[in-house]
C-alpha cells in the first residue's frame, strides 16, 4: 500500500520558515507518510494579527488549489490556524491546523500546559480556545515574549535565550508541557526542552501526526455536515481554485 501524502502549507511567504517547517514535518512523518511542503506565494512575510491571517489564508488557498498532484491530508502550518475552515470546504480530505493539534496533544500528554508566544500572541484568544475545547482547567496561561515572528528565522542565541526565559517562567508556574505559538519556533525546540526540563511539543509535528492519525480512521471524502457546500455557483478569477471549488478535483 502506498504511503499517504500530506500537503503541509505555510500561509506566510518566508522561505527560511518554510524550510524549518519542512524539516520538522518530515521528522514527524517518519516512515508513515510522504510530506510535501509549500508556502504562500502572495501575502505577508510573516503572520502577525488578523489582517495578516486573512491575507495569508488567501495565498494558502491559491497554493493548495494550484497543487496538481494528489494528496491525502493538508496541514496548515500556522499556530493561529488561519483558513482551516475554508480549506475544509475547498478540499475533500482532512485539514489539520497545527494550533488545535498542539492543544489536543498537550491535553493528552500533560497535567498542565502553557504557551510561549511571539509578541502578537494574546492570552485572551488562547484562553477562549482552551475553554471551547474543554481543556481550560489544564491551561496555565500564555507567556508573551517581545520577539517578532521574523526573529525566529535568526540563529541569534538571544532569540533562544528569550524563549527559554519565558519557558522557565511557565514551568515555575506549574506547566509540565509547553507549546509555542508560531510554526517558526521549530529548530529551537529541542534545545529549549533540554534547558527547561519539561516536554516541549513542536506544533508542526503535532499537526503532521494528527493528520496521520486521521487518515488511519477515515479514507472516504469529507462531503457532509460542515463540509457540505450549500449552493453551487460560478467562481470569477481565482483560476487555481476552480477545479476544487466546482468539485472536479
PLM regions and their residue ranges:
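N-terminal beta1-alpha1 ligand-phosphate binding loop
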Residues: 4-28
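Periplasmic-binding protein-like
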Residues: 8, 71-78, 174-183
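Short, glycine-/small-residue-rich phosphate/pyrophosphate-handling segment
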Residues: 16, 107-145, 158, 213-249
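C-terminal alpha-helical cap/extension of soluble enzyme domains
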Residues: 24, 30, 36-43, 50-52, ...
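N-terminal beta-loop-helix "entrance" segment that forms/cooperates
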Residues: 37-61, 150-155
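Short, well-structured alpha-helical segments in soluble
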Residues: 54-70, 160-174
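Glycine/small-residue-rich loop that forms an oxyanion/phosphate-binding "nest" at active or ligand-binding sites
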Residues: 57-111, 115
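Active-site rim beta-loop-alpha module in soluble metabolic enzymes
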Residues: 127-183, 188
Amino acid at each position: 500500500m502506498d504511503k499517504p501524502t500530506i500537503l503541509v502549507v505555510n500561509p506566510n511567504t518566508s522561505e527560511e520558515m518554510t524550510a524549518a517547517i519542512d524539516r520538522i514535518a518530515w521528522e514527524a512523518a517518519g516512515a508513515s507518510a510522504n510530506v510535501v511542503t509549500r508556502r504562500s506565494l502572495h501575502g505577508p512575510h510573516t503572520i502577525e494579527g488578523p489582517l495578516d491571517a486573512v491575507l495569508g489564508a488567501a495565498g494558502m488557498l491559491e497554493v493548495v488549489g494550484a497543487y496538481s498532484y494528489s494528496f491525502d491530508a493538508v496541514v496548515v502550518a500556522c499556530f493561529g490556524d488561519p483558513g482551516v475552515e475554508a480549506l475544509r470546504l475547498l478540499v475533500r480530505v482532512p485539514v489539520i491546523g497545527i494550533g488545535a493539534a498542539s492543544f489536543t496533544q498537550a491535553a493528552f500528554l500533560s497535567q498542565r500546559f502553557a504557551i510561549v508566544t511571539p509578541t502578537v500572541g494574546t492570552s485572551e484568544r488562547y484562553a477562549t480556545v482552551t475553554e471551547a475545547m474543554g481543556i481550560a482547567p489544564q491551561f496555565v496561561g500564555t507567556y508573551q515574549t517581545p520577539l517578532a515572528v521574523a526573529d525566529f528565522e535568526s540563529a541569534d542565541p538571544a532569540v533562544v535565550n528569550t524563549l527559554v526565559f519565558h519557558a522557565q517562567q511557565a514551568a515555575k508556574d506549574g506547566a509540565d508541557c509547553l507549546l509555542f505559538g508560531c510554526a517558526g519556533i521549530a529548530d529551537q525546540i529541542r534545545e529549549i526542552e533540554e534547558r527547561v526540563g519539561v516536554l516541549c511539543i513542536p506544533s508542526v509535528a503535532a499537526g503532521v501526526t494528527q493528520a496521520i492519525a486521521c487518515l488511519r480512521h477515515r479514507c472516504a471524502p469529507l462531503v457532509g455536515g460542515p463540509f457540505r457546500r450549500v449552493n453551487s455557483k460560478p467562481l470569477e478569477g481565482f483560476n487555481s481554485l476552480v477545479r476544487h471549488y466546482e468539485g472536479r478535483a
